[in-house]
Amino acid sequence: MIKDPLGAVKSTFAEEVNRVLRDLGSATRFSPIQVSRVRKDYASYGLPVGFKVAKDLNLDPERAAKTVLDRIDMSRIAYSSDAYAESGYLNLRIDKARFFRDILKLASSEELGRGERKGVVGMVEHTSANPVHPLHVGSGRNAVIGDSFSRILNFLGWDVRRHYLVNDCNLQVAILAAGRSKVRDLIPKGKVDHWFGLIYAISNAFLEIWRIKNGFNSESKIEEWSEVVERIGRMEPELLRIGELSEEEVMSLLREYQRKEGGSVQMFREITESVLRGFVETLERMGITYDSFDRESELIWDGWVDRAIEKLESSGYLKREGKAAYVDLWEAAKGDENVRKVFELSEDDISKLEREGKLGEVIPRKFYLTRSDGTWLYTGTDVAYSLYKFDGLGVSFCYNVIASEQNMEQKGVRACLALMGHDPGKLIHLSYEMVNLVGAAMSGRRGLYITLDEVLDEAKRRVEAILKERGIYDEEICEKVAIGALKYGLISVSPNKVVQFRWERVLNLEENSGPFIQYAYTRALNIIKKAQGVPEDFDPNELKSDAEITIVQMISEFPERVWSAFNLMRPDIIASYANELASQFNKFYEDHPVLSAARPEERAARLNLVNAVKGTLGLAMDLIGIPRLERM
């Protein structure tokens, strides 16, 4: 059975029209995306054939459409019944009964739109938060987007590996390690990532105070950082023992660890593994898991950074300033077509920008990979990681889910990948904006943030209060509704827009929320349970009201929405679809008795419709990671 009946209608209709146009000598071609439903006719789909080919055929639009119609072979078009020309359009009428039956059967079995396995392995790298403080709500958005996009790819037929890059070799971890080295005797309290977050914040504050005193930081005042020290000191007085940290103290630890020397290895690993355990606990609570945690340190120790440097040196665009290595992206863009593609510029564009003195606004000239002391920057290890993904793991493509503030750095990484001989188009930046938790200010360096754990706990408390008001309380239900609410709140906005996170919207049980969708799914499930089964045999022609037909049409569009979410890198499209379908189903249920339908034939058809809604909503929920509930 075709797993996307509507897609089959559109593609075969466009293909057949194109075949006829070739025979008629017209160069005009149509794509499936141009096939649209004829207004007020649920069973007809049209193409503006007459208007597009009138000039080619030297006919008026009406006559051109009829000329094409006369040559159409209906047997080549999926689900076709007949066709007709009207007002310059060529319209296809489908076999409603067969089309509706297949749609409902596929949706009920949760096979609608599911892709055949492609035998192609891809990767989605997401979350990859620095292991220095607890995950905050912005990291949560990254995780939810990355997890959902992985699910979409898998549903469409790709074999997807979910990876997390553990950034254990950066300056932030070195600051945390320097602070921890002063209080090695202290045993972590509470959730371990929260505890290390306090050490990081106070250690960073002590370092900033040292920088100000020694003339390395003129933008901050000692009082600002002293307030951070005092605030955290009131929470954990023992951490005041850390005291001032110097730049050299921190950088010495970082150099040691990157070189795998001294006692730093054990301490860095203890810290990062501990924080990572806290991350995993939070993310698994949200139903988010990974296939691999790749460590930045091992990219250095196992030689991947050296391989990357060798390849970049071979390209001729790697330059050095003492121990600092960088790629000259201006020269690379002038000399390498694939680098120009990364920045979406032609040779003429680059020449023009250079003449106008504006090239630096579009391409940073020096893309540094190491610091002046030779330690690796995150850009250097990111370049090495990209090489490892393709040469080490052998993936065919990789999506990096990284915040929009890293747009230029990601272009630099992709440009380096091109210079190392790989297609930069295979490394895709899935960019997203941040989360504004209305009424809260956040700064990890100052220890001011709303953790993902806190948001989850608050969501659960609020759900408990709402459900208790309704005379319902169940621990598992509260947890799953809270998770659904949070995840929908983070994913229902297009990645290129800032999320304005408001509790009143996130927990709205009436519309446009995770709980609203969960409730609609549970309602459909319970109808099926009460019916004690769904009749295998039913007459699709019994579904004739506008509400019933609208639902079938919406269900038929599910595969199209999934492909749109993939092509546009927008999981929010599926979230919006789930909300629309839930809303339409609720309207249907208000006016259409199912279990008490007037006739057995009507009851059978409506039960199949409800079962299809359940299956489609369930698939949509799975793709955006919202838990299914059997009761609510």
From Swiss-Prot:
Q: Which UniProt keywords apply?
A: Aminoacyl-tRNA synthetase, ATP-binding, Cytoplasm, Ligase, Nucleotide-binding, Protein biosynthesis
Please name the Gene3D superfamilies in this protein's record. Arginyl tRNA synthetase N-terminal domain, HUPs, Isoleucyl-tRNA Synthetase, Domain 1
Task: Extract the InterPro entries matched here.
Answer: Arg-tRNA-ligase (IPR001278), Arg-tRNA-synth_N_sf (IPR036695), ArgRS_core (IPR035684), DALR_anticod-bd (IPR008909), Rossmann-like_a/b/a_fold (IPR014729), tRNAsynth_Ia_anticodon-bd (IPR009080)
Q: Pfam families under this entry?
A: DALR_1 (PF05746), tRNA-synt_1d (PF00750)
Q: Which reaction does it catalyse?
A: tRNA(Arg) + L-arginine + ATP = L-arginyl-tRNA(Arg) + AMP + diphosphate
Cellular-component GO terms for this entry: cytoplasm
Q: What is its main location?
A: cytoplasm
GO MF terms listed in the record are: arginine-tRNA ligase activity; ATP binding
The name of this protein is Arginine--tRNA ligase
